[in-house]
Amino acid sequence: MLKKILMEVVNKLKRNDSCWCGSGKKYKKCHLEFDEKIDAIKFDPSKGQIRPPHKIINNAADIEGIKRAAVINSGALDLAGQMVRAGISTLEINDAVHNFIVSHGAHPSCLDFEGYPKSICISLNNVVCHGIPSKNEILKDGDILNIDITTDLDGYFADASRMFWVGEISDEAKKLIEVTKEIMEVGIKAAQPFHFVGDIGAACNKLAKANGFSVVTDLGGHGCGKDFHLEPFVSHDCKADTGMLLVPGMSITVEPMINAGKKQVTTDKNDGWTVRTKDGSLSAQWEKTILITETGNEVLAS
């Protein structure tokens, strides 16, 4: 223990050292006050409260990089939405989006991620997430679908998803889509500096239950920016005042997956990716990447 304490003292930055964030500024002019503020917080281990590691905090250059990736990502989602119509295959949408992203000098992050075979995820009706585009999956009137796209531009990642529908959809589907978007926005509003990640999930779950819907707990949001998936895991069903501390410079996704029926899901045994509601009920999801700021948060990708 004594050796560990001594190492921490030795490794502690001095005021005139370069800041750990990579900004090139002196520590005293950059993150010294930030670290002192976090040091003063008394974390409660019984609530799983932890401080965020420095490696997930973005500096100004990182934030600009994420924003540039987000411009392409937003354009890709716009294109995908324009293509949604009865008679088109989900593979056609995938291929068009792939070409769009590549033509802008970026890379579709989903492609080959842990073996995922396509460039985007398209999840229809009872598919919760990770639906694999296929030439055999043809959109028809009454379908609802989530299109999830992540773009990597020069090593910076922007992740977002939107809901779309084809023709006339059921009242249940309309309500699910609308309420799920509201749930995402409530979660984003709860993401405040020097509060905890659990506040997001508590807010999301409260609104979902009030509308008779359930929150998928097996999957959630994540840190995103300098890599596709970073800490922390962002649950959309948990207790407030728990988990990792949210601090300025963190970028995370808020992406509640909401089922019209029960929360249980199952993963396709054949493709290993497609996640469906276990009871066959409809599912919806909206997602934005946000930045925690000194005064609240800022949407980076939507």
Task: Set out the residue ranges of the language-model regions.
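Active-site neighborhoods and metal-handling regions in enzymes and metal-associated proteins
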Residues: 10-16, 23-302
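N-terminal cationic and glycine-rich segments that engage phosphates or anionic surfaces
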Residues: 2-6
